[in-house]
Amino acid sequence: MLTYNFENIGSDTLYEYLYKCIKNDIIQGKIKSGEKLPSKRALAKNLAISVITVENAYGQLAAEGYIYSVPKSGFYVVDLRDDKMKNESGLSENRIYSNKLNLTGGKNGYIADFTSNQTEQSAFPFSIWTKTMRAVMNDYQTELMLNPPCGGVMELRQSIADYLKAFRNMTVRPEQIIIGAGTEYLSSLLIQLLGKKLKYSVENPGYHKIAKIYRSMGACYEYIEIEEDGPKVEELEEKEINVIHCSPSHHYPTGIVMPISKRYELLGWVTRKKDRYIIEDEYDSELRLNGKPIPSLQSIDVSGKVIYMNTFSKTLCSTVRISYMVLPDELAERFYRELSFYSCTVSNFEQYTLAQFMNSGSFEKHINRLRNYYQQKRDRILEAFLQGALKTKIKILEEDAGVHFLMKVDTNLSEEEFLDKMKSKGIKLAALSSYYHSSEKKKKYENIYVMNYSFVDCEKMEYVAKMITQVE
């Protein structure tokens, strides 16, 4: 009987993950050609999943030519090694080999993918960015050939410091700013800097990758429950946490904006013991659509215990891997003393280009355009959803900050069944419960879905609304 582990399936639904697992086993020869697959009911019982999940997985495998159905008998594996079969199906040895590792990634064929954090082509300032790159090539030829300092090119760090002062009221020196290719890289540096003896915390529900980074670095961590106003401070004390990673401006995925009272409560917690720190992750704070930004923790911290982290991946595009962290003075001095042997992971060319883009005022203009763009996009999506029969079937939550909102669906289906049904219609969703670590708490978030809308086509929203309406 086929057996698979469903604990770490990422953003896939059960049916998609099951389909990928079976396909991989067929390609690698673990399931032999001509072998009969278990019946849908038997496999569902063995894996403790629904029959419809197995049915959808088998249907996808059959559609792609990996298995075939014999009436009143079941599903059998196609002989992929047979020359005749290869010619008829178009499968070459190269394709079979490349598929062995193709469990995730690649271009998807969804009509609407609400799990993607990519940026639409029309939202990126190509002409200005290209013009800036040309200017850098002409004006910085000597600088482009030099190795950058470990913390990054000083010109970009000064540009970021000026930007933070103007728009977040943060007074920082450029020497406190460390540039890196992605927050994952910067997080690994932080763990080395703060030490693995400290205990770190991960928000629950929260961003899965944070826990994976701590685990891969061998750091000790605990999950901290997120309340209606942010992390549970009493739990930080109970679990003897030293370092909390949080997103006060816009928690992902709940969308909670931490009120100023909770921010001061966290600052009170961090000052009570010596080896305590707050990592403030403001990954999409610039994209707050309504109201003025609430002050950052770093801007109201007087104890030097807040490490501020941000990225340009949300404001420019996901493939621009430029992030930065602002270290308190004491940690900055320790960084240069202990970790200055690390080379900056962002090229000089990218750093000077971004610095010039910011210094010219183009970044500020781009942010303003981007806010308007996403606000109009969000309004169009909500307009399509909140009319007709669908209006009584869903409830929209936390729609004012960032480029995602939550959607609660009134349905008799389980989450698994609803996700599979949507996937069969070309609509990819992620359940809020999938971001929760503890299975007994997931019921609280039943049938609430995280709707990332940065990469969806507004023209397809009427179709999406119609498909959701049809689900019982």
Where are these regions (language model features)?
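N-terminal basic, amphipathic alpha-helical segments
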Residues: 1-134, 330, 340-347, 355-358, ...
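Proline-centered loop/turn at the N-terminus of a beta-strand
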Residues: 199, 242, 277, 305-307, ...
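Walker B catalytic acidic pair
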Residues: 281-282
